[in-house]
Amino acid sequence: MPLLGLLPRRAWASLLSQLLRPPCASCTGAVRCQSQVAEAVLTSQLKAHQEKPNFIIKTPKGTRDLSPQHMVVREKILDLVISCFKRHGAKGMDTPAFELKETLTEKYGEDSGLMYDLKDQGGELLSLRYDLTVPFARYLAMNKVKKMKRYHVGKVWRRESPTIVQGRYREFCQCDFDIAGQFDPMIPDAECLKIMCEILSGLQLGDFLIKVNDRRIVDGMFAVCGVPESKFRAICSSIDKLDKMAWKDVRHEMVVKKGLAPEVADRIGDYVQCHGGVSLVEQMFQDPRLSQNKQALEGLGDLKLLFEYLTLFGIADKISFDLSLARGLDYYTGVIYEAVLLQTPTQAGEEPLNVGSVAAGGRYDGLVGMFDPKGHKVPCVGLSIGVERIFYIVEQRMKTKGEKVRTTETQVFVATPQKNFLQERLKLIAELWDSGIKAEMLYKNNPKLLTQLHYCESTGIPLVVIIGEQELKEGVIKIRSVASREEVAIKRENFVAEIQKRLSES
């Protein structure tokens, strides 16, 4: 039977006859009633919309705009960080801002609840990336890469309570450096700590300390203290809060909320208060409980070797073996570390800024294998720089000192004291641009000279080239120093070379 659309011919004929039939009185009344109801609803909605208070324009909670002033400071920080990564031979890369939700789940322990999920898109469940490490591991497994040294700068998203006054956001930038591949023990790990020291020293944020531990030592400590293996990750997450909470509060969480026996928590407390240098590593080798745990001994052996390399790098004095460091993320398997500022540069009488850790990282040898169909592992170690917190510290320091920054890099301004000289200015600025010189001009046919000079002073442009009737007649260009207000006349054909000379000397 032939079809019209999806209905047989007879069905279409029946439907059309009903639609074309004149309406009865009851139907007409019902239609009129429905029309009145719809009109009333629409009127109510419009009225409610009109009575609605003015819309408040703002950024979403936990996010912020970056002004040109902020971007100048941020770019300087990122340039320093990236140049350090490149100095150590890293290659740049990027991954999508969102991943399949399955890629990210079960990688972050209790923090998995902080991921931002996206609405279903064509049958795929997606989440915004929580960090840059898991996407990197997925990339290695997907492309069967066995060895790589990479850096990655990008935004990540976490649905946590933001503390913007301390540089904590829901959307923030991370700068990661990672070494993937099978190498001799602790050599890549030592380089990561060296990079961390170079960056924090270069940023001149003040004195800092890098805490180190090993997840095998943490797990061994839990085992000898009597923590059930099923509670290892949950208790690890509690220990990770010791940088923000007092021991009594962490103990309360472990005992009351996570069901740990009080005597077990007390045994853990004896360990997590220990911190020191390589001598503490030696001391833990002799510990009557830890020395009986194979995992802990492996971790202590690697830390001893690590301190040997750190001494050769000249940074051992910046490193502290700290048994309270746990790093709550599930994917860490070996050495872990975290950098904290001991004091930030502040004026006398001011409280030091407390922003928590400014860099962290560790070894994650099993993460790539989670994505490989055959479970092939690619050992990895890396670090992440907390750009937002560092930026907050630098920003506060500049505010305290009253420092200002230039928002442009313009070197030369093209000006005129007379009307109808737009074409000449366009010729001059084109020559400057073509010579690689950063130049600007006002987008007006007849700008006032005073306005042009004031613009240079307010934006920090060092040089002005001036073209007018007299200069055009004599075949010269005036070059003016904004700082000294001195002017010299240079032949038209030599003015670019003269500017390049002055810029190279400044």
Swiss-Prot record:
Primary localization class, coarse: mitochondrion
PROSITE patterns listed in its UniProt record: AA_TRNA_LIGASE_II (PS50862)
GO biological process, alphabetically ordered: histidyl-tRNA aminoacylation; translation; tRNA aminoacylation for protein translation
Quaternary context: Homodimer.
Top EC class for this record: ligase
Modified sites of kind N6-acetyllysine: 444
Classification via Gene3D superfamilies: Anticodon-binding domain, Bira Bifunctional Protein, Domain 2
Tissue expression as described in the entry: A high level expression is seen in the heart, kidney and skeletal muscle while a lower level expression is seen in the brain and liver.
Lineage, top ranks: Eukaryota, Metazoa, Chordata, Craniata, Vertebrata
Pfam family, one: HGTP_anticodon
Alphabetical keyword list: Acetylation, Aminoacyl-tRNA synthetase, ATP-binding, Deafness, Disease variant, Ligase, Mitochondrion, Nucleotide-binding, Phosphoprotein, Protein biosynthesis, Transit peptide
Location in the cell: Mitochondrion
GO molecular function, one term: ATP binding
UniProt name for this protein: Histidine--tRNA ligase, mitochondrial
Binding annotation for L-histidine: 131-133, 158, 174, 178, 327, 331-332
